[in-house]
Amino acid sequence: MNPVNATALYISASRLVLNYDPGDPKAFTEINRLLPYFRQSLSCCVCGHLLQDPIAPTNSTCQHYVCKTCKGKKMMMKPSCSWCKDYEQFEENKQLSILVNCYKKLCEYITQTTLARDIIEAVDCSSDILALLNDGSLFCEETEKPSDSSFTLCLTHSPLPSTSEPTTDPQASLSPMSESTLSIAIGSSVINGLPTYNGLSIDRFGINIPSPEHSNTIDVCNTVDIKTEDLSDSLPPVCDTVATDLCSTGIDICSFSEDIKPGDSLLLSVEEVLRSLETVSNTEVCCPNLQPNLEATVSNGPFLQLSSQSLSHNVFMSTSPALHGLSCTAATPKIAKLNRKRSRSESDSEKVQPLPISTIIRGPTLGASAPVTVKRESKISLQPIATVPNGGTTPKISKTVLLSTKSMKKSHEHGSKKSHSKTKPGILKKDKAVKEKIPSHHFMPGSPTKTVYKKPQEKKGCKCGRATQNPSVLTCRGQRCPCYSNRKACLDCICRGCQNSYMANGEKKLEAFAVPEKALEQTRLTLGINVTSIAVRNASTSTSVINVTGSPVTTFLAASTHDDKSLDEAIDMRFDC
């Protein structure tokens, strides 16, 4: 797979670092914003550290990578990515390894420029950015184990294709090649030697043209004799560390030719760069004791200030005659698809457009005078960004914000417990399971927190017996009935022996002793009883039963006078409310 995000972030970060102006606070802010994103794009999804021997899924479009030693372990991503679950599809990605090396070289370059001093002086974001720089530089130190200085150049990962073939004479004496020193002059239309994708011709180069202040020479101690028979038709390898390795020494030129004719051409094309990455077997020829003595005052141009101490370099050459010109270790991929589906871990702020190679390095022209250093008074910095291994970034939140969110969460939970204190246990468990969700990846300080509540399911039936926390069937008695208090009829009442006298139409049932005719009619309509026979008890004969069939209720009630004392015992019905 092609790491589009990491490549685009590397190009943007390199352009900002190389064009950094101490008097421009906006550039400082952009660098502080892009460096954490670049570091996050090269993080292992399992351990969270910088990738070591990175492997990536072959048939996936997600930007998730793991170390070779972390293969098979669980990724720290929530939710998990469905595209890279199968570790059998993971293979070694060489372009990712190159990007990791470029990240280390970029960190080393920053540590030896004025940008590092500005980062240390910035109180708001110094700790996080310094941690990222130390992560890249210390990782490179452990890999290379240099002995001369703490931040040295690591060029062992930068093989350079060469057309010259070394001889097999191991007894060649060390001789400085001062005559073959190449000084590059940059015209007004050329931007640090990279104007277009197709490279530049040799007409733009000059021999022994000084730097903006004075001429700089590089002494190269060679351990072998180089054949120079066909150097008129071929070009020696040129190691431009600013464009390839982004190291701190400005321009290091390893020249093995006695002269260069103006008719030759120096081409830097994307195809040759990609083809150079495929050459695995390269003959390594070491050039030790490379001592750069460059001194200049331009901070963002092709020449940088360096100390006079000697640094150990390991420059490698290959004997592949098919490749000519420069070879960049930072591989430039093909034009990436911008309309791809973005993953959930990427926010809108992370969408960085890929930049062409011609705009990586922008510096002043040769004829321009050295810029006047302006002391910067104000520094604008963003909120410190903490890297998260699941593909996203979260800004660091201060302790006060964390405490406020904790107390807010407790208050919400306490309020929800009070509101559901009189519900059934089943609904109470459902409400406890619904917790407030605070977004972690896109949470910015100052933005209101959104609390998600689940709407409780509406209950069927009346509230009788369900009003308390522990429902009971013996609660609906007389005035304790909530439906009776609200003058409503009970519906699907769970109470045993519900005696609510209100009907569905809002009218109240009448007592039997008030209007007996209407009370019996209401009873028949409410209970659905067909009044065909009523047992009447007589005071004298308790077993006598009068069957009233076919006659209306009024004739039955009118059959006895009001003086009859057995009328109270005749109708065996009670209405207790």
Curated annotation (Swiss-Prot):
Region: Sufficient for interaction with MSL1, residue numbers: 1-116
Annotated ranges, domain CXC MSL2-type: 457-508
Keyword annotations from UniProtKB, A to Z: Autism spectrum disorder, Chromatin regulator, Chromosome, Disease variant, DNA damage, Intellectual disability, Isopeptide bond, Metal-binding, Nucleus, Phosphoprotein, Transferase, Ubl conjugation, Ubl conjugation pathway, Zinc, Zinc-finger
Pathway: Protein modification; protein ubiquitination
EC identifiers of the protein: 2.3.2.27
Cross-linked sites for Glycyl lysine isopeptide (Lys-Gly) (interchain with G-Cter in SUMO2): K375
Keyword DNA damage: yes
Zinc fingers (RING-type) by residue: 44-85
Binding locations of Zn(2+) 1: C44, C47, C67, C70
Residues given in the record as Zn(2+) 4 binding sites: C462, C483, C490, C493
Sites where the protein binds Zn(2+) 3: C462, C464, C476, C481
Effect upon mutating M317V: In KBHS; uncertain significance
UniProt-annotated binding residues for Zn(2+) 2: C62, H64, C81, C84
GO molecular function, one term: histone H2B ubiquitin ligase activity
The keyword Membrane is annotated on this UniProt entry: no
Subcellular location: Nucleus; Chromosome
Chain segments carrying region Disordered: 405-427
Biased composition (Basic residues): 407-423
Chief location: nucleus
Family of this protein: Belongs to the MSL2 family.
Purpose of the protein: Non-catalytic component of the MSL histone acetyltransferase complex, a multiprotein complex that mediates the majority of histone H4 acetylation at 'Lys-16' (H4K16ac), an epigenetic mark that prevents chromatin compaction. The MSL complex is required for chromosome stability and genome integrity by maintaining homeostatic levels of H4K16ac. The MSL complex is also involved in gene dosage by promoting up-regulation of genes expressed by the X chromosome. X up-regulation is required to compensate for autosomal biallelic expression.
Disease: Karayol-Borroto-Haghshenas neurodevelopmental syndrome: An autosomal dominant neurodevelopmental disorder characterized by global developmental delay, intellectual disability, psychiatric manifestations including autism spectrum disorder and attention deficit, dysmorphic features, and motor issues such as coordination problems, feeding difficulties, and gait disturbance.
Subunit structure: Component of a multisubunit histone acetyltransferase complex (MSL) at least composed of the KAT8/MOF/MYST1, MSL1/hampin, MSL2 and MSL3. Forms a MSL heterotetrameric core with MSL1.
Protein name as it appears in the record: E3 ubiquitin-protein ligase MSL2
Organism: Homo sapiens (Human)
Organism phylogeny: Eukaryota, Metazoa, Chordata, Craniata, Vertebrata
